Amino acid sequence: ACQNLADVAYPNGHVVPCSLMTLIIAGSGERKTAVDRWFCDPIREVEREKMGEDKQQQWQYQKHLGIWKTKRSEIDKKLRKETRDGEPTEVTESALSEMDEIKPTPPKNHQIIYNNTTPEALASGLYQNLPLGYLLSDEGGTVFEGRALQDTTLINDLWSGSDIRVNRKSNDSFILSDARLSASLMIQPEVLNQVLKKKGDKLRETGFFARFLVVYPPPHAGYRESLSYNKPGEDTKQFQQRIRDRLKRSIDKLEKGEQRDILEFTKPAKRLWEDLNFMIQIELRPDGVFYHAKDHGEKLMENITRIAGVIHLFENDDYRSNITEAELRYAYELCRHYSRHYIDHIVGEPRIVTLANELVRAIRLYGTKRGDCEYEFIKTTIKRRAIRDLRENENLDNALGLLMRTGHVQQSRYSNSQYILYEDLFEAVGNREPEIKNGYFYHIKELPIYEPKEKRDEKHREQIEARNLRKSSPSREGDSGSGFGQ
C-alpha cells in the first residue's frame, strides 16, 4: 500500500524502495487464509473498485476509438483516391499524420494482485497496467513449484527497483522502469522443506530468499479455546482503513504522474543507523551469527531501512517528515527477531552456536561443579578433552567468546586460564544486561533463554526465600512422631 508513496534514503544518500517481501511458514489449520483475508481484503477492495472504474473508462475508450477509426478510414480513402487520380496528396497525408497522433490510448488496468504467474506475464502486467504490484499466495508452494520462480532475477530486480529489459519473441520487447513489487507468500513447513531440498542452494545463491522477511509463528491448531473466527476489532478496522487510504494515495500519485517522496532519517536516527549497520557487519565475520548466512546478513540492513520507512509512512499522516530514531529502532528489533526465523528454518543452526552448545556440554562433563548451577573450568583442560572441533584454538576461542558475550561465562579473577560457567544469569551479571541476549539473535539451547531484569530479580528473590525457608525449618531427625504408640 505504501510502496509508491516514497523511497528511503540511507545516511549516505543511497535510495531504496519501501517494497517488502514476506514468507510466512505455517502448517495446515493455522488459519493462513483468515490472515490473508483480514489483511489483504482492503487491497482487493480497492482493486475491485478501481476495476469498476476501468470498465467505464474502457467503454469510453472503445467509443472514441470507433470514432477515430471512422475518421481515419475516410482520410485514408481520400488519400487512395488522390493517389489513383494523380492529384496532390500533401494536405491529406498531413491530415492522416495528425489523426495518427491523436489516436486514443487504452486506459491502464488497475490490476494490483498477481497470483501464480510467469515472470514475463508479471513484468508485462506491471508494464501495461499499473507499475505497482503485489505477488500474493496463501499456498506458497504453488509459487515456488510453479512458473513464477522460473526467473528469480526478475523478481530480485523488481524488489531492488531496477529497470528491467524484457525480450519477447512474439511481441515487442520493452523496458520496465521504476516499478514496485511487494510479495506475501504463505507455505507449509513440509512444502518448504521440499523446496529447500530441490532449489534451496540456488534460491539462496541468487539472493532470492535473502530479500524475504521469514516468519514462522508457533502453531496454535489444537490449542484454541473457540472454533469460531474472531470478528475484526476496532484496531483491525482502523488498520484496514489505513491500508485503503495509503493504497489509494499511491495510485493517485501514479495517475497524476507525481514523483515518489524521498524519506530521510533524523540526525539521531542517522547515527543509530550507522551503529546498527556496524553491528551487523561484525556479525558477518567468521565468529558471527551471519557468517554462514551472508546472503541474509548483507540484505538485513536494507530490510530494516525499508521497514522503518513503511512504519513511518503508515503511522504518520504527515509522512513527509523524517524517520525517527524510535521508528528505526523498532524496525531493527522486529527484523532481528525474525532474522532468527530465517536462520533456524532456511539456513540451519550457525556453526558458532553449534560449537557453543558443545562447549557447554564439555564444561559440564570436565569442569568442577560449584553449587547448583556453576562450573569452574580450565580452558586447556576443555581443549584437551572436548570434541575434535573444540581442540582447534580458533573454534574454542570463538565459542568461548560467544558464551562470555551472553554473560554466562566469566573469567576468574585469580587466573587467566580459569573460567566459570553460570547457568543462572543473575549469578553471573546481576542487574547488568549482557551484550548478547540468549534466544534473541543467537539461541544456545544448552543455556536458559534470556529473561528481562525484572523477571531475573523476581526469580532471585524466590530462590532466597526458598533457601531461608529451608534453613528456618526444624530438622525432622529425632522427631517423636505423631503420638502413635505412646
Predicted ranges, named:
Residues 1-486:
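Phosphate-handling catalytic cores of nucleic-acid transaction enzymes
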